[in-house]
């Protein structure tokens, strides 16, 4: 699946579209796991996928789970094999790739069959030997400089398998003279998933007041439960809405987007009493209206607040995964939400992967592509997920220069025209019937 600045995944219920986001969360969860021996951390805070048999297609334990990830680094990475200036540089470049395969039919549980890192025109692979599940070979291929791993003198000890399906074992570094750079590959992989942030579709109810310990959260929480904490932690920071525009306080940026969505006239978070550490989120829905708490207005405001906050709070260049960001919003606000996504993607360089059911959000996104000044079709990837015979199928939607979808799937966003035609047919039938009586 090719991802753009904004990647939208649409589809029917239970078609498998959420699985795409879940797998990225699974890899992040595995990276953060404390058990170095685990291949995939299938159950944790981010996702709960059960056992390997639950996660594999049709529960077929003879199948393997394999994946391939490729992304462009912001800065070129140059690997160094050793401190000697005469040593061959293993690889360099901006194009970074990673592949792995995990099988679940081992007696000891899921095991990683291989991991492979790629940088530029070089590849470094740790792969299970054919004779023994616990012994692995470390090898390299390069079309540039012919780099190869050099063993230390002495007995050739076997190399154990990967750690957490992405990291090389310590022996891969100690058994070779020129393999210290493997840590740089692992660190690049870890940095990628450290920069992945997630907001789920089920968000917390708003509260009448919030206790803030004056700490800085990593994000807004998977249910948006730390959105107010994030706003308070960033309140002394500034952001701007576009290149060359005036910087505004972080809280003002949040208020701006809530107003653009047509949900409020003003928004602020203030302490109940000095040094109380208890804060209240207050809004004014219309100019001249009374100021009320977040709990006393429409539910949609509290549900979209974490979306806006997360997109403005995460570091520039982050990857944000969103499930149904439009939930509980009326159609006009759903349309305007597309502008929130576009600003974060194009101005803050946040890569957004979202799962949505909103035709209104999609229509605004298409409109902005047609206008061409805020986002182009080259920056957007759209996919449709369906499971006509119980097996998920992902179709890439063809978008032209003006945002028009060339291969619009049947019943992509329901059958609005069919409903109108059926209603008109029923209306005529009843009118004829009433006249004949």
Give the residues covered by each predicted segment:
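Phosphate-binding P-loop
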Residues: 1-4, 285-286, 311-316, 343-347
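C-terminal lobe/lid and adjacent interdomain/linker elements of RecA-like ASCE P-loop ATPase modules
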Residues: 336-437
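Walker B catalytic motif
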Residues: 322-325
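Post-Walker A helix-loop "phosphate-sensing" segment adjacent to the P-loop in P-loop NTPases
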Residues: 26-38, 315-316, 345-346, 372-373
């Amino acid at each position: 699946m090719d991802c753009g600045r904004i990647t939208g995944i649409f589809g029917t219920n239970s078609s498998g579209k959420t699985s795409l986001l879940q797998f990225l969360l699974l890899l992040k969860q595995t990276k953060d796991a404390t058990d170095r021996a685990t291949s995939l951390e299938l159950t944790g805070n981010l996702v709960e996928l059960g056992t390997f048999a639950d996660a594999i297609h049709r529960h077929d334990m003879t199948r393997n789970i394999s994946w391939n990830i490729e992304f462009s680094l912001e800065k070129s990475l140059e690997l160094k094999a050793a401190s000697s200036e005469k040593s061959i540089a293993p690889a360099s470049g901006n194009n970074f790739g990673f592949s792995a395969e995990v099988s679940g039919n081992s007696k000891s549980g899921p095991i990683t069959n291989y991991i492979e890192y790629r940088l530029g025109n070089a590849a470094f692979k740790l792969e299970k030997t054919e004779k023994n599940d616990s012994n692995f070979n470390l090898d390299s291929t390069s079309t540039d400089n012919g780099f190869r791993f050099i063993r230390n003198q002495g007995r050739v000890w076997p190399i154990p398998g990967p750690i957490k399906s992405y990291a090389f074992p310590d022996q891969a570094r100690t058994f070779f003279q020129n393999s210290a750079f493997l840590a740089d590959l692992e660190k690049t992989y870890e940095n990628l998933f450290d920069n992945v942030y997630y907001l789920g579709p089920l968000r917390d109810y708003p509260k009448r007041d919030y206790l803030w310990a004056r700490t800085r959260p990593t994000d807004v929480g998977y249910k948006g439960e730390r959105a107010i904490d994030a706003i308070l932690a960033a309140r002394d920071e500034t952001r701007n809405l576009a290149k060359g525009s005036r910087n505004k306080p972080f809280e003002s940026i949040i208020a701006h987007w809530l107003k653009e969505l047509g949900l409020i006239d003003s928004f602020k978070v203030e302490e109940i009493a000095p040094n109380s550490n208890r804060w209240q989120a207050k809004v004014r829905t219309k100019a001249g209206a009374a100021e009320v708490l977040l709990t006393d207005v429409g539910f949609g405001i509290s549900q979209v607040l974490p979306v806006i906050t997360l997109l403005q709070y995460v570091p520039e260049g982050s990857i944000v995964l969103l499930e149904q960001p439009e939930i509980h919003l009326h159609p006009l606000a759903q349309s305007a939400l597309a502008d929130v996504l576009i600003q974060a993607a194009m101005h803050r360089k946040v890569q957004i992967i979202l799962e949505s059911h909103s035709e209104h959000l999609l229509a605004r996104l298409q409109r902005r592509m047609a206008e061409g000044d805020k986002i182009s079709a080259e920056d957007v990837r759209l996919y449709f997920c369906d499971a006509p015979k119980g097996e998920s199928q992902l179709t890439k939607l063809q978008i032209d220069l003006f945002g028009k979808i060339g291969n619009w799937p049947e019943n992509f966003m329901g059958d609005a025209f069919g409903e109108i035609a059926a209603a008109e047919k029923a209306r005529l039938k009843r009118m004829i019937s009433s006249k004949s009586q």
